[in-house]
UniProtKB/Swiss-Prot annotation:
The keyword Transmembrane applies. SUPFAM superfamilies: Cytochrome P450 (SSF48264). This is Cytochrome P450 monooxygenase 81. The lineage of its organism: Eukaryota, Fungi, Dikarya, Basidiomycota, Agaricomycotina. It comes from the Eukaryota. The gene is CYP081. Glycans are attached at N503, N516. GO terms for cellular component: membrane.
Length: 547
């Protein structure tokens, strides 16, 4: 063969390779186009406005339930976005090929800026190392020791609400109370720090910063999308100076909030470090008496081998991470439970009787409280039907094939048993779609029925399990990045309900409650109010006197 031909041959080979690449990309994109889903609302923004709108709950339900376990919506300029609730596909994305399907760059950049290099902001080896150290800290063994802290907080909440309703039933914003309760529970149980005396209507600096974080971020929603491009621009002092003099007040507010959270976390950390160095007696004098998550974590880190130890900066970052991840999620779920119990007074009374019969108000050991069947059913059913986080995004870092448990019929009638997904495709993990599928949970799957947990679950659920860490549900996600605090959260909810239902009754008011779409769903009175709240009529429960 003549060597003169080599450049020509290389050129042809290169052109064929590019052609094959483009063909593969085109064919995979056209596979995505063939997936059923609602038509785009706009040529420019596809279905994005409908999906992210505050009142987008009906649209999200439509996509979750009316097109099958895999559906498609449209992003910018009609770019396909996959909505996935198929069990095998979820297993592949979140467990089997977790390294391929990553959180978006924008997510990592944002969480890093807000909380530092904690669990939410790290990936790969760094994240694995943090989880290795943290998983045992969240074990049931430690949760058992934490229960007295939870009860202590709830008894204060009980006394505070009693003061407000002692003259007769009152309308009370139970979301606000659940927010204060969840913050104090993660404060004492997570950080060994008290935010709120739970008597007066006051709050502290850290609590205030945390409360304003979500609304402030909501107001700079569009600018936030630039973060991945600018967050490593220049040295840290330069970025801080730009933020300090930024012409938009909301951006300066966001910086103030982050600064406050970081300063407070560092102060709490420093005082814990001193106490740990002084020994057990000093630790016992701290809030949480050394049984809180941060104290256990710091101790575990100091005893870990050098290879497993994580730097101080990463320990401090976990504090804001826990506070952020633990408060809105738990408080909104608790508000939803109370609202459901007000809508279903018979279930409210049955649950109260179960709790009173077990004497769970003052204190109950972890395993006994965990075993109360209706209490467990009410928590699981609320987390199933009303997951606070309805969906989360993942993006494959390479072209890949997504296998399915059941075939999807394309819009052109083609039957697909797997889907070719191009690199960079946005995938929405269908938490709501998976938790509520009729094919899995039966014809009444959309209804809130805690009793369904009192008998064995249908075979359609147990024989085709989803990878979720909790109860055949996707509410706390799955795999390496699943919620680390789900047991903590479940125990919080059970102690809150044990104490509140032993003392109070909850009824609906005549105000219309709307649940809004956001990172975590939240209630308002009507669809126009900007104030997150759940007013309920709260009265004292008169316990029957013993004969
Ligand atoms: C009802 C309450 C809760 C819900 C619905 C919930 C839900 C979730 C979900 C869906 C994720 C996955 C996020 C993602 O993949 O991007 C997550 C992660 C996380 N959650 Fe929760 N959560 C709750 C309560 C808590 C509590 C009480 C804590 C702490 C005590 C906590 C700490 C975390 C942390 C640290 C992560 C990040 C885990 C990692 O990336 O390794 N969560 N949570």
């Amino acid at each position: 063969m003549s060597t003169d031909n080599i450049p020509t041959q290389l050129g042809i080979a290169g052109a064929v390779a590019v052609l094959l690449f483009l063909l593969r990309r085109w064919s995979s994109r056209s596979t995505l186009r063939n997936i059923p889903g609602p038509p785009p609302q706009s040529q420019w923004t596809g279905n994005l406005k409908q999906w992210f709108a505050r009142d987008g709950a009906d649209f999200q339900r439509d996509v979750s339930f009316n097109y099958g376990p895999v559906a498609k919506i449209h992003g910018f300029l009609g770019r396909p976005i996959l909505y996935v609730a198929d069990p095998k596909a979820l297993q592949t994305i979140l467990v089997k090929e977790e390294q391929v399907y990553q959180e978006t760059k924008a997510f990592f950049a944002m969480t890093y800026l807000l909380f530092g290099p904690g669990l939410l902001a790290t990936a790969g080896e760094k994240h694995r190392k943090q989880r290795k150290l943290l998983n045992p800290v969240f074990s049931i063994k430690h949760m058992r020791h934490m229960l007295p802290i939870f009860y202590g907080v709830l008894h204060k909440v009980r006394d505070a609400i009693t003061m407000r309703v002692s003259d007769g039933p009152q309308e009370i914003d139970m979301l606000k109370w659940m927010g204060r309760t969840a913050l104090e529970l993660i404060g004492q149980g997570g950080l060994g720090y008290s935010f709120d005396k739970l008597v007066e209507d006051g709050d502290n600096e850290y609590g205030r910063a945390l409360k304003h974080l979500q609304p402030t971020l909501q107001r700079i929603n569009v600018l936030r999308r630039l973060i991945p491009y600018v967050y490593k621009l220049g040295p840290a002092w330069f970025r801080r100076m730009v933020m300090h003099y930024f012409p938009l007040g909301q951006v300066r507010d966001a910086k103030e909030i982050v600064d406050t959270m970081q300063r407070c976390s560092s102060e709490i950390f420093a005082s814990k470090k001193i106490a740990l160095a002084r020994g057990d007696e000093a630790v016992m004098k701290q809030v949480g008496e050394g049984k809180d998550i941060m104290s256990i974590l710091m101790k575990a880190n100091s005893m870990a081998s050098e290879a497993d130890r994580i730097p101080e900066e990463e320990l401090v970052a976990q504090m804001s991470t826990f506070l952020f991840a633990a408060t809105d999620t738990t408080s909104n779920t608790l508000a939803r439970i109370l609202q459901q119990l007000a809508i279903h007074p018979d279930t409210q009374q049955k649950l109260r009787e179960e709790i009173l019969a077990a004497n769970a108000e003052e204190y109950m050991a972890y395993d006994d409280l965990d075993a109360l069947p209706l209490l467990d059913g009410v928590c699981r059913e609320t987390l199933r039907v009303f997951p606070g986080v309805t969906n989360l995004a993942r993006t494959p870092t390479q072209d890949t094939i997504l296998p399915l448990s059941e075939p999807v019929v394309g819009t052109d009638g083609t039957v697909m048993r797997e889907i070719l997904v191009p690199r960079g495709t946005e995938i929405l993990i269908g938490i709501q779609g998976s938790n509520g599928r009729k094919e899995r949970w039966g014809e009444d799957s959309y209804e809130w029925k805690p009793e369904r947990w009192l008998s064995p679950l249908p075979k359609t659920v147990t024989e085709n399990p989803v990878p979720g860490v909790y109860s055949n549900l996707m509410t706390f996600m799955a795999g390496r990045r699943a919620c680390i605090g789900f047991k903590f959260s479940e125990m919080e909810m059970k102690v809150v309900l044990a104490v509140l239902l032993s003392n109070f009754t909850f009824e609906l008011t005549d105000k219309p409650i709307q649940w809004n779409i956001s990172g975590v769903r939240y209630p308002t009175v009507g669809k126009d109010s900007n104030v997150a709240q759940l007013p309920l009529k709260v009265g004292l429960y008169k316990k029957p006197t013993l004969q």
